[in-house]
């Protein structure tokens, strides 16, 4: 029988459940007096991160003379931080985000993101807040917490903050991964590969796990730890072998942020990727003054997939990319 691809890939029953879950999420934030905000999906700039590929489009004036390049946002992060600098206080947003070259069991080019920021909140305190959120929404047990360093030592018997390339290649060979790693000479990329292939699928099986203090090389937009410059104030959330969220105690130093953007673009050039225009609106907000804060981005489709006990996010989205 021919597949009815015009129909929703999620059942109507599951779409009703999805709607109820999102209502409960909004209720959670409403009870905490956290402001729900809306920011643009179109942006004049995009991310420099080498791991993200943005969708781009063009605005054309009514007389067809002027053209403005725009990007679909990979997350609402930069716009929400501009609101934080405008003294919005604690905020959250549920919105669609867009990432090219991402499609699979846990990926769709268009997906739903929950992003949440809490000013004057340490990473440790924010993790406790997110844990409460997960217990309420997922109806799960209290989470575990472990450092990135300790995970590597527990699983692979190696310290990622001290290891050299030779040691990592020896571990890769022992794990029979050398066919994937033998040509990799970037220490940080090799560490990330080992984490993705050998640690990530095996953590957070029974309850959510917060992995914190990622190496400084993987800081992204997180601050560097003041006591140990080898680590960042970045954390990720895993449950049942799936990455659910990514969070930071946020970098607020405009000069350091600009350096990271420039470094990203240098890496893009070395990888023959397009150089990205730096978001000067965002840098201006940092220059004006972003309050010390923590933030997290949670993949809402993945969260709902776990709640409804589905095997793919395509079972909880009405029209994924093959049906849109």
From Swiss-Prot:
Pfam families: tRNA-synt_2
Entry superkingdom: Bacteria
InterPro entries hit by this protein: Aa-tRNA-synt_II, aa-tRNA-synth_II, aa-tRNA-synth_II/BPL/LPL, EpmA, Lys-tRNA-synth_II_C
Catalyzed reactions: D-beta-lysine + L-lysyl-[protein] + ATP = N(6)-((3R)-3,6-diaminohexanoyl)-L-lysyl-[protein] + AMP + diphosphate + H(+)
A GO CC annotation given for this chain: cytosol
Keyword flag Nucleotide-binding: yes
EC code: 6.3.2.-
Listed Gene3D superfamilies: Bira Bifunctional Protein, Domain 2
Any one biological process term the GO annotation gives: lysyl-tRNA aminoacylation
Binding locations of substrate: 75-77, 117, 250
An MF annotation (GO) of this entry: lysine-tRNA ligase activity
Keywords: ATP-binding, Ligase, Nucleotide-binding
Subunit-structure text: Homodimer.
HAMAP family: EF_P_modif_A
UniProt cross-references to NCBIfam families, sorted A to Z: genX, PRK09350.1
Its job: With EpmB is involved in the beta-lysylation step of the post-translational modification of translation elongation factor P (EF-P). Catalyzes the ATP-dependent activation of (R)-beta-lysine produced by EpmB, forming a lysyl-adenylate, from which the beta-lysyl moiety is then transferred to the epsilon-amino group of a conserved specific lysine residue in EF-P.
Family of the protein in this entry: Belongs to the class-II aminoacyl-tRNA synthetase family. EpmA subfamily.
Protein name: Elongation factor P--(R)-beta-lysine ligase
Organism: Buchnera aphidicola subsp. Acyrthosiphon pisum (strain Tuc7)
């Amino acid at each position: 029988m021919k597949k009815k691809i015009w129909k929703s890939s999620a059942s109507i029953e599951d779409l009703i459940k999805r709607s109820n879950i999102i209502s409960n999420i909004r209720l959670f934030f409403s009870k905490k007096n956290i402001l729900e905000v809306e920011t643009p999906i179109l942006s004049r700039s995009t991310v420099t991160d080498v791991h993200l590929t943005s969708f781009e489009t063009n605005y054309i004036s009514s007389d067809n003379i002027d053209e403005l390049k725009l990007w679909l946002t990979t997350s609402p992060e930069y716009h929400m931080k501009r609101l934080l600098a405008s003294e919005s206080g604690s905020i959250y947003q549920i919105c669609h985000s867009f990432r090219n070259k991402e499609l699979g069991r846990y990926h769709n080019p268009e997906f739903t993101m929950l992003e949440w920021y809490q000013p004057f909140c340490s990473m440790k305190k924010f993790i406790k807040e997110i844990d409460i959120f997960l217990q309420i929404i997922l109806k799960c047990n209290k989470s575990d917490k472990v450092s990135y360093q300790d995970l590597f030592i527990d699983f692979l018997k190696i310290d990622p903050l001290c290891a050299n390339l030779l040691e990592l290649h020896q571990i890769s060979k022992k794990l029979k991964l050398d066919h994937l790693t033998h040509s990799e000479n970037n220490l940080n990329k090799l560490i990330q590969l080992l984490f993705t292939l050998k640690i990530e699928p095996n953590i957070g099986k029974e309850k959510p796990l917060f992995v914190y203090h990622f190496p400084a090389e993987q800081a992204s937009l997180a601050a560097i730890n003041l006591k140990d410059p080898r680590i960042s104030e970045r954390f990720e959330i895993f449950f049942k072998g799936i990455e659910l969220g990514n969070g930071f105690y946020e970098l607020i130093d405009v000069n350091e942020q600009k350096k990271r953007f420039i470094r990203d673009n240098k890496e893009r050039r070395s990888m023959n990727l397009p150089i990205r225009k730096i978001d000067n609106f965002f840098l201006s907000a940092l220059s004006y003054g972003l309050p010390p804060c923590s933030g997290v981005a949670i993949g809402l489709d993945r969260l709902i997939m776990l709640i409804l006990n589905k095997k793919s996010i395509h079972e909880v989205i009405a029209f994924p990319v093959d049906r849109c």
